[in-house]
């Protein structure tokens, strides 16, 4: 285990730091497993497994693999889908975007070198037998004794001798549902026995990387693990092979707890936030992209998987329908320049009711449809009703929330509020999408009922937008009651609210010592108000409904605040 200490320490840090994106997936994985067991032709599976053991594979072999992958993908609910992610200044700072672009480029070069060729998207060993023999002859002529191609320990190189190497991309990698189905059907085991065996392996994985010795010991207690291969994992090995790494990935899904990275789900609405958190953990722990060809370290592996799709289950879902590589599907736009800060209007002024761009208006409508009009719904704002700078709507039963910002009209009042209340900085709101708060309020369901700590400001905000049909219930907590769970909420969910960077000072009574305080974040306030009313902090993880890129104006947006 000593060799794995630095690497596993990174894994543990990533598990802790990204816990808000991990999910209990055991039920979902087993649901897909049962679908595969009932409908998959395991004779075809056996033929694919036989094919990948061949030393040389051809176009017809690749066609069989891709057809098999399509059948598996059609039977599974857990999958990643094709999505192009373009990150701009706003959700991430320019320095963070530059860091991400650099890491993706380093990763591209490393993967390319590892796969053995100069062109991206081509896997190691994509040489014909004739080319391999010519290479060996060249090495011998240069004095290298016993020259033979690098490969397995027996010296055998397994190659894909095909016309279009890009067809290999994303056709490999194990899927827990498929691994469990193969262990059950081909191992002649009961599904429950396989689940119990993998659960034991998963518990071990919470404290270390399981190795072959561990596998042998666990096999004595769980015979279902006997089917796991003792051969080392290699590149371009299909997800139908029952390797130790495939078993460990499946085992991670059997542990509903432990914040396993394998259980991360990526959604477009939280992609930028996830990347931001990943970069923060990387810098805090001193993680890096290694230049040495070979297996990816935990940071490299997670970065690649997240950036490959940005929509789905990066570790455990079917990804055969995804085209391209991580650096193809996630790009950084550093050319977008921050919009000029608009001059403030004296003495505030009413919010501008101009419409936002059509595509963002559609996104707002889709996001609001994710809310349940009949469920308990908290709302809070920072700023004044006629000049709000932040708004949050939160439904504790599902964890769904809508959270956005707005650049203020009254700069002087804003700075005063920042100093004594919310801690937001003017420069961080310069690119906030104008008209977003108005658009959200305009599209809220008719007669929806909201819960708030202090209803006057919310009612005035609704009335200014002509929404007298919306109702607000005031819980009327005291200042101390409202913030009973403040420290716990900030400790658990601080990564959801990254704009409140300013120093907040408690308003002191005459003669009292001046002290600092936590800033008031509209989103975290709604969560802590709910905790006070219910008496506990809910386990339900907050889930963003409004994509983070919608919060910031495009470079072409010319709508004034």
Swiss-Prot record:
Entry binding sites for Mn(2+): 380, 382, 525
InterPro entries with a match to the protein in the record: Nucleocapsid_arenaviridae, Nucleocapsid_C_arenaviridae, Nucleocapsid_C_sf, Nucleocapsid_N_arenaviridae
Transmembrane segments: none
Record region (Disordered): 336-355
Stretches of the chain forming a coiled coil according to its record: none
EC identifiers of the protein: 3.1.13.-
Keywords assigned by UniProt, alphabetized: Capsid protein, Helical capsid protein, Host cytoplasm, Host-virus interaction, Hydrolase, Inhibition of host IKBKE by virus, Inhibition of host innate immune response by virus, Inhibition of host RLR pathway by virus, Interferon antiviral system evasion, Manganese, Metal-binding, Ribonucleoprotein, RNA-binding, Viral immunoevasion, Viral nucleoprotein, Virion, Zinc
A GO CC term attached to the entry: viral nucleocapsid
Assembly and interaction partners: Homomultimerizes to form the nucleocapsid. Binds to viral genomic RNA. Interacts with glycoprotein G2. Interacts with protein Z; this interaction probably directs the encapsidated genome to budding sites. Interacts with protein L; this interaction does not interfere with Z-L interaction. Interacts with host IKBKE (via Protein kinase domain); the interaction inhibits IKBKE kinase activity.
Stated name of the protein: Nucleoprotein
Source organism of this protein record: Pichinde mammarenavirus
